[in-house]
Each structure stands twice: as C-alpha cells, then as structure tokens.
C-alpha cells in the first residue's frame, strides 16, 4: 500500500468504477425485503451546499448499510425545476449579459432559454453528488419537468378538479410586486420595523354623533394609502363608546364613499382608538371581517404595487359589482404605493382630518426572494381544498403508520395540519408546469390533460377559440408527488409495487409543511394498496437539524460564512476562498467585513481533507437537535482518523501478506489480546448496529472512532508485538488470523460512513481471507456473535491496560523518558492480580517498558517509590536514580507560576463588564472552559509536588 493516505488519488476513480459496474442498482431479489429512500430533489441549476452534503451523507450511510444486509435497495435520485429560483437566475443572466427582460424574449423563447441553462448548469449538482460518494441509481434519475412527471402532475390536477378538491377563486394572496407573482405564507419573512400609526377622522353621516357628542370617528391605521379601498369601519359590539353607532354610516374622506359601521370582535377596545378601517381587498384580517359582514371588496393597486387609474369593485363572492363607484381621485392615480401613502396623509391633513401621528412598532412582511414588502392582493388563483386531504394524513401519524424521528416533530406537524388553510397552487411565472385549464371567450373554464381532450369531452368544435391558463403550478405541487411519480405512476409499474411505500424520508424540519405534509396528503389520496387502504409515502421521517457556522450563525452568502463542502474535500487557497465569498455579492458593502473574518478563520485557506473525512464529520455531528454548529477541528480529527486507519492497515498487511494467516487450516493459538479484541469487536458491532437502526448516526460514528482508534490501533496492534517478535508458529498463525479477521470486519462495519478508504484497503485485505467478491459494497454487514465475547479475556485485558496506563502516567508526571526501562513492584496483590501478572509478563514488560516485575508481600514497605492504586494491587515504581528531587520541585514550581499567570489573566477578562457585555456567548464560554482547564492542571501539579516532596 502507498505510504500515505491520499484521498485525491483514490476517490474519483473508485466512484467511476462503482457506477460503471452497476453496484448502485437494486439487486432485484424480490424474496428479500425492499428498502427505498427518495432523495429530496435539489434545485436543478443549484450547487451542493452543506445541508445537501449532511442529508445525503445520512441517506447514503443508510442505503449502504441496508444494501449490505442483502435488501433490494433503491436510492431514487432526481432534481427539482425550482420555479421561482431558476426563473430569477435566468432573468438576471439575460439582464446582465444581453440587457433584456423575459418579456423581450416572449414566453416560448424564454422557456427555451431556461432549458438551455438547465442543459448547461444542470449537471453541476449531480456531478457534486457523485463526489460525495452517493450510491444512487443514476439510470433512474428523474427531473420534476421530465415527460413522465409532467404527465403525473396533469393527472393529479385533473382528478382533484373533477373531485372538486381544486377550485379557482378570487382570494387574498401574498403578492410580490417585484416578482409579480403570488407567494406562499412560508416564503414570507416578517421583519420588525419602526413605523407610525396615523389617527384619521372619518365624518359620521346623516347627523349621527358619538356617545360623547362628536360628529366623527377616529380611525387608527398604519397603512393610510389603503383608505382609498375602505368599505367599512369596525367597532367592538361591546364598546360603550360606539355600540349605538353600529348600522350607521361614515363618509370616507377624499373619496366621499358612504360606508357602514359594523360590530366585530376584530376591533379591540383597548387598541388604538377602538375603530378599525376595513379594506377587504388589501388586508387578510379585513378580508375575513368583510366576509362576515358581506362588505364589498375594492382593489386599488396594480400588480406592480401602484395605485390604479380606476378601482376594481367586487362583491363578497368576488364577482364584479357596481355597488360603489370605481373612481379614484386623479391626484393619487399611478402613484407608487409608498408615495401614495405620503400623498394620502398630506391630503387628509389639508382637510383638517389628521388628528395625530404616533410612533408605532410593527411587523412588515417581506418576500424572501424578491426582498420587497409583500402586498395582500385580491387575485384569481387556483386552490387545493386542504382539509379533506389533511384528515387521513393526520390519522397516519396518529396511528403510527408514519413515525417522526425525533418524535417531538409530530407536534409541529399536528399543529399545522389541524389548522390547515386551502393551498394556493398557482404562480404567475413562466417556468413550471402550466396549469391544464383552458378558457373560451365567454370565460368558461375547462380542465383536462390537454386541449384535444378538453375539446372532445366538452364537444367544442374547432371554431371555438380556447386559450390556456397563463399560470404555472407552485413548485411544491409537483414535489408533493415525488415518492410515487418517480416510480412511474399513474402506470402500475413493478417499481411502484416493489418500492412504495418508501422506507425513510430524510428532510430538514424547515420544510415539514412545504413538503413532508403535502407528500403525505397527496400520496394517501392517490395511492391505495390492494385492499383500497390509502398508502403512506414513507414509514419514517428522519428530521435533521440545520448546519450553522462555528458560532451558531446560519450560513448565508450575505454573512459570508458559507463553506462549500467540496472545498473541504479538495482544499482551496485563501485568494480563491475570498473571491468565492465576496464575488457577485447582492450587498457589496459587506465585502470588507467578510474578507477580514475569512482571513482570520482560514489564514492559509482550507486544506484538502477528502470525502471520507467530511462524511465522518457530518455523521458525527448528526445529533437530534435543531441546530448543528460546524466545527473545522472535528473535520481535522476525522482526517487524522482516516490516516490512522490507513497506517494501521499497512501495519497489518506488512505483518500478514505472504505469511500463513491460518485461513487454510493449521493449528492456531489465540493470545489473550486476540481473544480480547474479538470480544471488543463483537460488542462494537452490536452497539454500532443498534445506533444505526435507531438513526443515531452521531453515536455510531463515536463507537466506530473509539474502537478503531483506542482499542484496535492504540492497544491491540501494540499487544500483538510480543507475539510477532517471538511467538510459536501456532501463536503467530492465531494473531495473524485475528489481525486480518478484525480488520476485514472493521472495514465492512465502517464502509457505510467512509466508503472510499474502506473499499481501497479491503481490496488488499480480501486476498488474505480468500474472498473473491468484487466489492465491499455488496459484502454482508458484520453480525454480532455472542460466542466470540470472552468475558474473562475482557476482564484480564482491562486489568493489564490499567497497569500499563498507571506506569505511563508515572513516567509523564515524573518527567521520566519514555524509553527508560523501569522496575515495577506490586504490593498486596489479590489472587487474580497475581495470576494476571504471571500469565502476561511478556505483554506487561514490552508495553510498559519494564526491566523487571516483582510481587511484594502486603506488609513490605519497599524502597522510596511513587505509588498508584490499581484493581487488586498497589503499583510502585522506585525512584532511586531516576529523578533529582530539588530540580524536579523547582521545575514544578515554575510550571505552577506560569499557570497562575494564565488563570489571573482570564479571571480579569471575565471580571471586565465591558468584555462580558460585548463578546459573543461562544467566546465567553470558551474562556470559562480554558479557566477550568488551567485550574485542573494546577491542582495536578500541586499533587505532584506533594508526592515528590514526600520522597
């Protein structure tokens, strides 16, 4: 084997070989259980980020683990067309490169442009997924807008429409005036901001007066520009100030519209003035009040967020109405919405109707992609009736057909599902699945799979002009069908029969509503088992946390703290990293701050660590919490682990290749160490499998690390040396056999998490075991064998380790060179301790570097020694001639003084109120941790001083 482990040389060629050989495909053995995971489809034109790397590592670990258990295993891969995100990227691209908008291209040509862009950049993410080692079946790769999936989408839309579960309605939606499309509640980001509350007088009509004799009501509002669309004023029916005015009217300032005063709980007696203006077409709460009191709806805004030249007036059901005039005063027409706000306030003030302006804290909704203030807008949209679909989806989780891991996420799911709103599925975009609905000139709507079907079903001749709905479906509509559409539905395919319901869905908790809930609803509605019972899309939902940076901040381009997973695999220089973090920024003014932070964090760029080290780190961080802080130190630690495994394997091969390892018969004697490592390894298999079976990848990674590093490399390989240097033929055969057996099993055990290094080493080790199979990927996963767990060997070896560690600690504490042979005395030995010494003198002398071992009677004082208590004996190392008492005490005093200096420096820092107030929580915690460490070190040194002073 190469002297040093170099992941760059082995990973990519190995992956290409695996893919070419078809190892990622299901084995097709229907006598075996099936295991299937659907990959959450990443955006087709996106690139791999830490969240992808994290979730895909977890999925690949599960897939490889189940495949090695002989299951018929499919990891279904595919990408998402990502409507709004992809359209924005291409719009920005043509604006930058050609100075054009999508309207210059027209719909058809612009969509062609997006397909071109997909062809050009659509391979990026799948190339990157290959770099991660993902063992997905690439031959089955799907795209949410490929022909098969597009047919499934149309099929679902048409069936739901025919069942009256999809309808078209005039409703209020979150409207993004910049992107000119409806967006979902989940894409709205609420930001706190300082604003004003304007108090405006609305004159009472017909000579009416308030309880205290005023001829007007004062209405408080944070959005005076919407006054132009008011159709009512609400007061609380219990409010003694106004309840007698319910049913009377006010005259709307500026517009002179006569609008009613209604009694509604929505008006809070304690808030503002107790009178609330009602604008059903421009506020979600007002829309509900309007429905309760049959108030008309007046839309005053264009889709760009400007004031219209004439208003649109609708009745409560959304039909056009002439109950009010559509006139808007000329001075406000065509004004941008925030300019209109100023103009309306000025006009009201000029009439003497502005009572006061108060500062007011408010929450303003912004679109998370367009970045502008969202406008509630009355539009025609398509909706899915969600309550009917939600009922079985709630029951599936209640009765355990679907389980959430960790379980607490069920509550989040229930709270949303039990209060579910109808789902607005239309988007005013060009890129996506176009809604399969057509209109004739009279405005009648026809829904069908294509125009031909529509004409045939509705007997529409060629003379009837039809135009297709311009809108496309919300991207999440097609994603909701992902588990079954990818397997060939609506056809009844073999794949659907074998792999559905799928086994596990791995997802971030942030899309539990966007995606998980909608998959459950859609799948259970459309997929039934042979008894007609609704099928769930998956049996288990494994929720991951979000990966944040080392300070717990969310990774984002604007914070400049994004780490590209492949930069950790391949390494990246500082200049390249800076360019990546500060190039093409939306907010270039942040570049300087980002540059400084990056230079501080990565003064030499990022070293290459290889894919296996990245995967091991991600698995080790996969705790059940919501947030996971990324830690470069852990990554370095797991790269060191890979080096350690490589070097240990070289040691094993150097001692076994070309030797008799006992695989072809011949007498074998197993040493205590051999019996011990086989017992340890079997206990490790048991615990590791339990961790993987319960989705505790962090615990599994810890078990693997601890066994490999501490037991196998640090202890067992050392314990084999006495046999290697002087054992009998049978002993040599036994130890070589054990070395090879444990290493080969360990490689299979570790393979799901670190596939590349394990396959590479295994190809060398398999020869020694007489294995002829081609790949570790399809080898059986190790199974626990209770007969290999020799309790006596475990107990005896733990005792030997305890004795060896005690001697090593005395060397370190007394500053004695590691190579200097020592005398060891054991006093007051129990029978077990004495037996262990006599049976294992060779081990003890070699590993603890001992000249001699002497057992003393319990009452023998012995020479001046440093003593440690171990199980069943006192361990003494005579100090004569080993240390100079005065020099050693002086050295320790110096060490203590140095540590005291550090302690007082940190104590002063933590006593400084300015520092504590300003420094981030993580920094303060680090300082406290350092302080604890120094205090412990000081206590140890003082203890040593006492020991030496007593010599």
Curated annotation (Swiss-Prot):
Residues bound to ATP: 557
Motif ('HIGH' region): 42-52
Coiled coil: 880-944
Name of this protein: Valine--tRNA ligase
SUPFAM superfamilies from the UniProt entry: Anticodon-binding domain of a subclass of class I aminoacyl-tRNA synthetases (SSF47323), Nucleotidylyl transferase (SSF52374), tRNA-binding arm (SSF46589), ValRS/IleRS/LeuRS editing domain (SSF50677)
Catalysed reaction equations from the record: tRNA(Val) + L-valine + ATP = L-valyl-tRNA(Val) + AMP + diphosphate
Keyword Aminoacyl-tRNA synthetase: yes
Domains as described in the record: ValRS has two distinct active sites: one for aminoacylation and one for editing. The misactivated threonine is translocated from the active site to the editing site.
Alphabetical UniProt keywords: Aminoacyl-tRNA synthetase, ATP-binding, Coiled coil, Cytoplasm, Ligase, Nucleotide-binding, Protein biosynthesis
Role: Catalyzes the attachment of valine to tRNA(Val). As ValRS can inadvertently accommodate and process structurally similar amino acids such as threonine, to avoid such errors, it has a 'posttransfer' editing activity that hydrolyzes mischarged Thr-tRNA(Val) in a tRNA-dependent manner.
Example of a GO MF term: ATP binding
Higher taxonomy: Bacteria, Pseudomonadati, Pseudomonadota, Gammaproteobacteria, Enterobacterales
Similarity comment: Belongs to the class-I aminoacyl-tRNA synthetase family. ValS type 1 subfamily.
GO biological process: one example: valyl-tRNA aminoacylation
Main location: cytoplasm
Matching PANTHER family: VALINE--TRNA LIGASE, CHLOROPLASTIC_MITOCHONDRIAL 2 (PTHR11946:SF93), VALYL-TRNA SYNTHETASES (PTHR11946)
Gene source species: Shigella sonnei (strain Ss046)
Cellular compartment(s): Cytoplasm
Subunit architecture: Monomer.
Residue span of motif 'KMSKS' region: 554-558
An example Gene Ontology CC term for this record: cytosol
Enzyme Commission number, as recorded: 6.1.1.9
């Amino acid at each position: 084997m190469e002297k040093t482990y170099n992941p760059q040389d082995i990973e990519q060629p190995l992956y290409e070989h695996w893919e070419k050989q078809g190892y990622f495909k299901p084995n097709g053995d229907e006598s075996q259980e099936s295991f299937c995971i659907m990959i959450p489809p990443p955006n087709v034109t996106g690139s791999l980020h830490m969240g992808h790397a994290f979730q895909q590592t977890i999925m690949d670990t599960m897939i490889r683990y189940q495949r090695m258990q002989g299951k018929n295993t499919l990891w279904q891969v595919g990408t998402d067309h990502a409507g709004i995100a992809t359209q924005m990227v291409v719009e920005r691209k043509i604006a930058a490169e050609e100075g054009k908008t999508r309207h210059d291209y027209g719909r058809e040509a612009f969509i062609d442009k997006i397909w071109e862009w997909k062809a050009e950049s659509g391979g990026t993410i799948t190339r990157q997924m290959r770099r991660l080692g993902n063992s997905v079946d690439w031959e089955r790769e799907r795209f949410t807008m490929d022909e098969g999936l597009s047919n499934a989408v149309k099929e679902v839309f048409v069936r739901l429409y025919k069942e009256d579960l999809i309808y078209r309605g005039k409703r209020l939606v979150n409207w993004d005036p910049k992107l000119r499309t409806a967006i979902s509640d989940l894409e709205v980001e609420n930001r706190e901001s300082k604003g004003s509350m304007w108090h405006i007088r609305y004159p009472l009509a017909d000579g009416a007066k308030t309880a205290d004799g005023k001829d007007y009501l004062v209405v408080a509002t944070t959005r005076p520009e919407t006054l132009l669309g008011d159709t009512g004023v609400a007061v609380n029916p219990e409010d003694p100030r106004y309840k007698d005015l319910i049913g009377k009217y006010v005259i709307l300032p500026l517009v002179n519209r006569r609008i009613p005063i209604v009694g509604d709980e929505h008006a809070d007696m304690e808030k503002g003035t107790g009178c609330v203006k009602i604008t059903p077409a421009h506020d979600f709460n007002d829309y509900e009040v309007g429905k309760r009191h049959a108030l008309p709806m007046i839309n005053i805004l264009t889709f760009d967020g400007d004031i219209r030249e004439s208003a649109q007036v609708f009745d409560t059901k959304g039909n056009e109405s002439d109950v009010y005039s559509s006139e808007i005063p000329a001075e406000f027409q065509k004004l941008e919405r925030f300019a209109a706000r100023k103009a309306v306030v000025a006009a009201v003030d000029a009439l003497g109707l502005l009572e006061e302006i108060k500062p007011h804290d408010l929450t303003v909704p912004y679109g998370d992609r367009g970045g502008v203030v969202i406008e509630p807008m009355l539009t025609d949209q398509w909706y899915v009736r969600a309550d009917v679909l939600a009922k079985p989806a709630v029951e599936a989780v209640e009765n355990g057909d679907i389980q959430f891991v960790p379980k607490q996420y069920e509550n989040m799911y229930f709270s949303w599902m039990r209060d579910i709103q109808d789902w607005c599925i239309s988007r005013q975009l060009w890129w996506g699945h176009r809604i399969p609905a057509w209109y004739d000139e009279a405005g009648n709507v026809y829904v069908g799979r294509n125009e031909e079907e529509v004409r045939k079903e509705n007997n529409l001749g060629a003379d009837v002009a039809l135009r297709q709905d311009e809108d496309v479906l919300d991207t999440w509509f097609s994603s909701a069908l992902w588990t079954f559409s990818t397997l060939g539905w609506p056809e009844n395919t073999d794949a659907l029969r074998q792999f559905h319901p799928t086994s596990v869905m791995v997802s971030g908790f942030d899309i539990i509503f966007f995606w998980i809930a909608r998959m459950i609803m859609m799948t259970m509605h459309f997929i039934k088992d042979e008894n007609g019972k609704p099928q769930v899309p998956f049996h288990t939902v494994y929720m991951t946390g979000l990966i944040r940076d080392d300070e717990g901040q969310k990774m984002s381009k604007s914070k400049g703290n994004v780490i590209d997973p492949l930069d950790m695999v391949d390494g990246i220089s500082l200049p390249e990293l800076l360019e990546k973090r500060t190039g093409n920024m939306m907010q270039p003014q942040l570049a300087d701050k980002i540059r400084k932070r990056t230079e501080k964090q990565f003064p030499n760029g990022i070293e290459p660590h290889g894919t296996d080290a990245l995967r091991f780190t991600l698995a080790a961080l996969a705790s059940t919490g919501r947030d996971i802080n990324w830690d470069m130190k852990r990554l370095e630690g797991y790269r060191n682990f890979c080096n350690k495994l490589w070097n240990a394997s070289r040691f094993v091969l150097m001692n076994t290749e070309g030797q008799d390892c006992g695989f072809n018969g011949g007498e074998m004697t197993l040493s205590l160490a051999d019996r011990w490592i086989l017992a340890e390894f079997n206990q490790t298999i048991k615990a590791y499998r339990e961790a993987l079976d319960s989705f505790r990848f962090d615990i599994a990674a810890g078990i693997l690390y601890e066994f490999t590093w501490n037991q196998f490399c640090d202890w067992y390989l050392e314990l084999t040396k006495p046999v290697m240097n002087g054992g009998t033929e049978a002993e040599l055969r036994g130890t070589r056999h054990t070395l090879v057996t444990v290493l080969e099993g360990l490689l299979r055990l570790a393979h799901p998490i670190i596939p590349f290094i394990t396959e590479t080493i295994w190809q060398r080790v398999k020869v020694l075991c007489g294995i002829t199979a081609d790949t570790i990927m399809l080898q059986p996963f190790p199974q626990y064998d209770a007969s290999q767990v020799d309790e006596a060997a475990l107990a005896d070896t733990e005792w030997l380790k305890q004795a060896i560690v005690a001697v090593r600690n005395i060397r370190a504490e007394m500053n004695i060179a590691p190579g200097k042979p020592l005398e060891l005395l054991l006093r007051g030995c129990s029978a077990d301790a004495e037996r262990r010494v006599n049976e294992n003198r060779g081990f003890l002398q070699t590993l603890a570097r001992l000249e001699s071992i002497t057992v003393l009677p319990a009452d023998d004082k012995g020479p001046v020694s440093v003593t440690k208590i171990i199980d069943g004996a006192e361990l003494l190392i005579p100090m004569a001639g080993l240390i100079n008492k005065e020099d050693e005490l002086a050295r320790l005093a110096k060490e203590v003084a140095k540590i005291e200096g550090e302690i007082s420096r940190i104590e002063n820092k933590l006593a400084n109120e300015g520092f504590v107030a300003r420094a981030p929580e993580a920094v303060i915690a680090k300082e406290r941790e350092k302080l604890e460490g120094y205090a412990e070190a000081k206590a140890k040194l003082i203890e040593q001083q006492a020991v030496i002073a007593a010599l």
